Amino acid sequence: MPTFTSNDAQINYQTFGDATKPALIFSNSLGTNFKMWQAQIDFFQQDFFVICYDTRGHGASSAPQGPYSIDQLGQDVVNLLDHLNVEKAAFCGISMGGLTGQWLAIHRPERFNQVVVCNTAAKIGQEQAWNDRAALVREQGLQPIASTAASRWFTEPFI
């Protein structure tokens, strides 16, 4: 998979479809990689130049020493567009990717035709809760948070 350098991170990305068509970039949620968008990639690549990337610290992208900021994640997207010589794109982000999309819409609107934010908020959780969750994963792996993650994403009848 191709990578490029954005500030201090190696960002993994992949493109699908014809680069002469309108660009559409997908941004993953916390704890996932760009493959979460596979159904959308398959559908949209006929009509769009689809760009997917792993947010820094996720998937095959590097995880330089943090902390990370939404400003930094947004700039990674702009740097990716620059790397691919894409002037303007549509953007779709979910959860953490949606936070990135909000930053892009506010700070770099000239680079985006549309910004779609899914399952996100202006602020998600408190800093200490995220720090505690990260420490738990570092110490014990993903298993301790797996069941609580499923309950946040799906209703009881679905699980």
Regions found by a protein language model. Name each.
Residues 2-6:
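Short acidic-hydrophobic surface loop/beta-edge motif
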Residues 39-42, 46, 79, 106-110, ...:
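Short, well-ordered alpha-helices that flank and scaffold nucleotide-derived cofactor binding pockets
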Residues 71-89:
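Conserved acidic catalytic loop of the alpha/beta-hydrolase fold
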Residues 83-126:
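Conserved hydrolase catalytic core segment
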Residues 125-129, 139-159:
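Conserved alpha/beta-hydrolase catalytic His-Asp/Glu region
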